[in-house]
Amino acid sequence: MNALDRLTGDAQTFIDKVWASSVHVHRTDPGLGESVLSLADVDHLLTETAIRTPAVRVAHDGSVLAESRFTRGGSLAGKPLTGLVDPVKLMQLHDAGATIVLQGLQRYWTPVSDLVAELELELGHPCQANAYLTPPGAQGFAVHSDSHDVFVMQTHGTKLWEIHGEGGPGELLLEPGVVAYLPTGTPHAARAQQAVSLHLTIGINQLTWRHLLSRLIDEVIADVPDEHLPAGYLADPDLLSAELAERLAAVADDVRRLDAPAATRAQAEQFLSGRPPRVAGALLDREALARGLSADTVLRRRAGHPCEVVPDGESLRLLLGDRVLRVPARLREAVDVVASTPRLAPRDLPLDPESALVLCRRLVREGLLEVGR
């Protein structure tokens, strides 16, 4: 089951009927949230690691607290460190009713990173993830709305949400197994109930029609000569208006000649080559390569890693998420097998044994494949 199915119950129905338009509530396996980010996971991050701001912020009674209230200084190899979270200060604030926010979890907590990476590929929009740890009976923020869509998933405890907007339930008790989708601008607030509450918010930093059209039109007007406006147009506006009409008509003609399918392909390629790197296990993979691959070595597609194949003359461009890899076009059939097969061995590729090993070694080094462990 893909990420969007897990969060919504039915990905296609969500895309067709809910996306960007209305609140949606899905009830799923109560263990889903804990498998992504448990209370023990958060305890580990806050009390056993050298986590620093801005990965953590703290809010109390609707206001974000100064970092100095929960951080300390330190040093590493003789160089100063700032913004280190002080777990003692942090717990004291939490005991007093403050909400602790873990920001950008997709960058440093693997289960969250995996979920977000899958969701990005399914939606075609960049995503981020924050977690909110709220003491019993506390409310971190007053009623507000976000400038992006969000999925909210309770992982521990319960929280009573006040949700307005199209399809909003008014009040919703969020507990493990409940996932809510709130479109941009949905007013909401939430209060923890009898126990400490932990929920994960996945924010969708949506790409918009305005964003796409602005980029395309910017490319068109980049060819317009950057010449002076006529002197004296303030006294005689006709000096400006007649030529402006001609230039606007020329720009409109250029816009009409834009190739929409080509622009769509360019948008997809930009997205599929501009994601953050995903190479967890790369050191272990290199150790496995040093020991040697065989025709029967089990290889897996790395989770959340795209592999879009784009023909380009005598080459193929492989869009790997964070970069573009070029390989000879004669490898098309083998590359298609890799792109469509979650688990394979070099012997599964339609190549001679040595060529199959060479290609697999390359794709392991590039991070698309990982050696089975």
Question: What would you call each of these model-derived segments?
Answer:
Residues 181-183, 372:
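Residue-level recognition of conserved beta-strand edge/terminus positions
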Residues 260-338, 361, 373:
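Acidic, low-complexity/disordered tracts enriched in E/D and polar residues
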Residues 1-18, 30-178, 186-228, 235:
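Active-site region of the double-stranded beta-helix
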Residues 4-8, 140-142, 179, 289-304:
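Short, solvent-exposed secondary-structure boundary motifs
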Residues 14, 19-21, 324-373:
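Long, charge-rich, low-complexity alpha-helical segments
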Residues 219-274:
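Long, charge-rich alpha-helical interaction segments
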Residues 57-59, 266, 348-349:
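Short coil/turn segments at secondary-structure boundaries
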